[in-house]
């Protein structure tokens, strides 16, 4: 608590009562609470005075909304990258933020703002307006922002004359001189661009050899000799463009998750003249493409099965056997087609488990 001897100012000072008898204690007007002892010379607020302060706060809020300047309030904003325009959603629609040169400044309230421009480029002043009728945030006119975005430099309606703002319009001679200077630069740029395009059209010798080798393979649909490729290097763009989408599709397929499922496969080794069957052939889900090859138990050569089928019962043709008389349980180490059934449901390696929790990227 504060000591009674010290004086503390109060934001709502009120004079003392005029009557001597009507002081800080109970009087004829009604029941008044006693003031605190640490604030001598000040009394507490009455109910009516609380209502007046509430009305005053409401009035201040209305004034802050109606007037262009804020009354006892602060404007909040989000800092963005000034080098890059960003679309902002406000009450009047989408607007584009201006660069750092066109921000709210004390000079903006006087009527106009001169943004920072590039070296040698004169821009007309822009009129500052409020974002909304009940907002105190100012911004450059929408028409001026659209003109700047489109490359135009025409003044807006609310602007004054260029001479009054301190800027000077370029004379016709200066405009003609500016237009005449960059013409040779554009021609040189066109020549350079044409040279780059011609260089891109002609593939390097390594690419030509690779394309010729790919097209000369026996598995290709339309073989083309390497001599024709050497004679017409410009025609190689078409096959390269056709090969690029295929490579991108293959890369996408490699990035996708491929689940594996178990199928039944027949194997045959021509060298050893051995034929065997396996019920645990890992194939890509939904296809008959074998992912893991099996090795011959004699010559230990990897072979893919010449035929792959789904693991189903031979009689009922189902993944889980529904026959009234089921065959004996299948041995995971030596699976045979006549022993495939659905009785190994809860086993570690079951015939009816088609999906694998292992996936490859």
Curated annotation (Swiss-Prot):
User: Which residues are recorded with the post-translational modification Phosphoserine?
Assistant: 161
Where are the stretches annotated Disordered? 1-23, 98-128, 148-252
Q: Name one Pfam family in it.
A: Zn_ribbon_3CxxC
* Resulting phenotype, residue 296 to S: In 4CS mutant; abolished binding to the 3'-UTR of maternal mRNAs
**Where does the record place it?**
Cytoplasm, Cytoplasmic ribonucleoprotein granule; Cytoplasm
Subunit structure and binding partners? Interacts with YBX2.
List the PANTHER family hit by this protein, alphabetically: ZYGOTE ARREST PROTEIN 1 (PTHR31054:SF6), ZYGOTE ARREST PROTEIN 1-LIKE ISOFORM X1 (PTHR31054)
Q: Per its record, how is this protein called by name? A: Zygote arrest protein 1
Identify the species of origin: Mus musculus
């Amino acid at each position: 608590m504060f000591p009674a001897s010290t004086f503390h100012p109060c934001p709502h000072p009120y004079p003392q009562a005029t009557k001597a008898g009507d002081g800080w204690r109970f009087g004829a007007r009604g029941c008044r609470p006693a003031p605190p002892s640490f604030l001598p010379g000040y009394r507490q607020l009455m109910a009516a005075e609380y209502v007046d302060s509430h009305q005053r706060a409401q009035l201040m809020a209305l004034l802050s909304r109606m007037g262009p300047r804020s009354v006892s309030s602060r404007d909040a904003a989000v800092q963005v990258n000034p080098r890059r325009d960003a679309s902002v959603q406000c009450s009047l629609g989408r607007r584009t933020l201006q660069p750092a040169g066109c921000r709210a400044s004390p000079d903006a309230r006087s009527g106009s703002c001169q943004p920072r421009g590039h070296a040698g480029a004169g821009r007309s002043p822009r009129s500052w307006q409020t974002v909304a009728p009940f907002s105190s945030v100012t911004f450059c006119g929408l028409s001026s922002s659209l003109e700047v975005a489109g490359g135009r430099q025409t003044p807006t309606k609310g602007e004054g004359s260029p001479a009054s703002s301190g800027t000077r319009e370029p004379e016709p001679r200066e405009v003609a001189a500016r237009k005449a200077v960059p013409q040779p630069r554009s021609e040189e740029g066109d020549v350079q661009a044409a040279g780059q395009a011609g260089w891109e059209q002609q593939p390097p010798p390594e690419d030509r050899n690779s394309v010729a080798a790919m097209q000369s393979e026996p598995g290709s649909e339309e073989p083309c000799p390497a001599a024709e490729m050497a004679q017409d290097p410009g025609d190689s763009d078409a096959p390269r463009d056709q090969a690029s989408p295929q490579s991108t599709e293959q890369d996408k397929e490699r990035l996708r998750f491929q689940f594996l499922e178990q199928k039944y496969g027949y194997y045959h080794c021509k060298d050893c003249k051995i034929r065997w069957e396996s019920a645990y052939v890992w194939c890509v889900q939904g296809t008959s493409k074998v992912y893991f090859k099996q090795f011959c138990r004699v010559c230990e050569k990897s072979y893919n099965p010449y035929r792959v089928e789904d693991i189903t019962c031979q009689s009922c043709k189902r993944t889980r056997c529904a026959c009234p008389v089921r065959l004996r349980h299948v041995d995971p180490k030596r699976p045979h087609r006549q022993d495939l059934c659905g009785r190994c449901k809860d086993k570690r390696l079951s015939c009816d488990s088609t999906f694998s929790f292992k996936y490859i990227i």
